[in-house]
Structure formats: C-alpha cells, structure tokens
C-alpha cells in the first residue's frame, strides 16, 4: 500500500493501472476495520489488487502519528473527492501535468457485505468501465 499519492500515480501510469484510494480511519472506524479484515487483508483481494490496481491508503487516524506532509495530502484528497464518511474507496486514474495531479474518477464504494467475492464484483464493475 502506498501512502504517497504522487508516487502511486507514477506507478499507476507506468503500469497502466488505476489507483484504488482507500479513505479510512484505521484506529477508530469500525466499518473500516471490518472492510480491512473481511476483504482488504484476504489472499483473494491481494491477488486481485496485484493484477488490477495500485493501492493507496489515505488514513485519518485519531491516535496514530502522521507526518504533517501526509496529513495535508490526505486532507486535500478528502476535499477533492468529497469524502464525507469512512470507509470510502475511490477508483481513479491519476494524470500529472506541470507538477499538478488531476484524477479521472471511475467510481466509488465502501463496505460491501458478503466478503471478498461480493466486494470484488463491485470493484470489477468500475474497472470494466475503464477499459471502454
């Protein structure tokens, strides 16, 4: 998982993969923790992610330390994507021009009941649009 969005965009462009931006409150958000446990930390998800996306974790912890740079980056991205609740997962392509990064959104989701297969079915729907 990347925490630096600029680095993730560069990798995504190089590998021709969209970003999966995971907006989470890792140390306080119950649904975020469930999504991690039930989907994001499973072998099925790991295999799928390696083939399809570049993973970016944008964390908004209450107790855990974050550098000022990461905190600022995450706040800007939360605003840019209009995230109002956690967990939120955005699929997007990032394009950097003249030092500025713009995102082309492919879709968003959050917690989906039913484990990895149910969650990945939703994710694959967004990625299928990318190929059109």
Predicted region positions:
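Thiol-based oxidoreductase modules, predominantly thioredoxin-like and allied folds used
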Residues: 1-2, 24, 38, 45-72
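A short beta-strand-turn-helix
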Residues: 1-19, 49
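Short pre-active-site segment immediately N-terminal to redox-active cysteine/selenocysteine motifs
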Residues: 16, 24-28, 85
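Hydrophobic beta-strand anchors of alpha/beta hydrolase catalytic cores
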Residues: 20-21, 55, 89
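Active-site-proximal beta-strand/loop segments in catalytic clefts of secreted hydrolases
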Residues: 23-26, 58-61, 92-94, 109
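Conserved redox-active cysteine motifs that mediate thiol-disulfide chemistry
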Residues: 24-40
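Extracytoplasmic/secreted cell-surface and envelope-processing proteins
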Residues: 29-32, 65-66, 98-101
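Non-catalytic, surface beta->alpha helical segment in thiol-disulfide oxidoreductase systems
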Residues: 38-40, 76-131
